[in-house]
Amino acid sequence: MLSGCVSPPGLENDIFFEQADISKDEAPHVANSLEWWYATGWLKDVETGDTFGIEFVMFHFSMNGKKDRLLSNVAITDVSSDKFYFDHTLIGLNDQLKSELPLQLSTARGKSQASIKGQFGEYEFVAKGHHEGEEFSYTLNTVSNSPAVLHGNKSGYENYGGYAKAGYYSYTDLATEGQIMVDGKLRTVKGSIWYDRQWNCGAVLQNRTTGWDWMSISLKESNEKLMLYRLRLREGLNIYGGTLVREDGTYSSLKSEEISIRDKSYWKSKRSGDRYPSKLEISIPNHRLELSLSMLKEEQELAIKILPLVKLYYWEGMCAVSGTRDGEPVTGTSYLEITNPENREK
């Protein structure tokens, strides 16, 4: 999402290892160029069955290696009411974040608040925001249904086409309970959250990347998970990658040449004027996967004001999945993120 920053953070304090260590890497990294704790989920009202999507992200970055910043983005998609709510808060810290667990990260400005507490799959996500005059909020608690997935051939460091590397692991199925408030109504909800932890991400922005498409996919019939991405480079090329998590919990990385992601239709935002792919076709022949991913609701674009005259737009929201696995029909759910959508192969 921060790929549109005018001045990307410096990389001098990013430290890489051969293997990620979740017991340490869950915590903030001192003076990191860019890192985040990211949650997206599908939830249902326990009484009515109404479906909601949530996004929570806490960015941490250091522009000069001395003072840090935190940026939170929060959102709710109300499927039954066809509404989308989002808010963000950017704050500067007086010092550097310390590498401490459990996590206790928070932002607050005016009436907008966001916080994450916890560690290793057990979290509390709290958000309170205002969107176009309407208040929304949630408090969600999670426990993990499965171990963490270490991307990048199980090293916990994803290699983006050989020119950039970043730490990356996920909890792909966090059992979630809590409350959501939209339209003045407090709802009790349950469901599943996908949690991403990434660090040392400044290198991805500093090089040739102009934008990316990232998606998490949960397949119902085969009980499998997929993380996929398409990085778009300045020279007009794409880099693909991802991880396939099988029903038994084993997982393997997907190489760029194994993956095809094609735009099939588009939606143009009236707010930003940007055109986003509204339907994607995904093919992974080596694993006999053929999937179609479609926006569940087109109006899931977020606007983030980084500087007084700089506003960044990106799309992130719920998508429906259909297709085949080993020749058998499958359906599923997804969250898709699209940044800098106009910088893509034609």
Go through each PLM region and give its residues:
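Bacterial N-terminal signal peptides
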Residues: 1-3
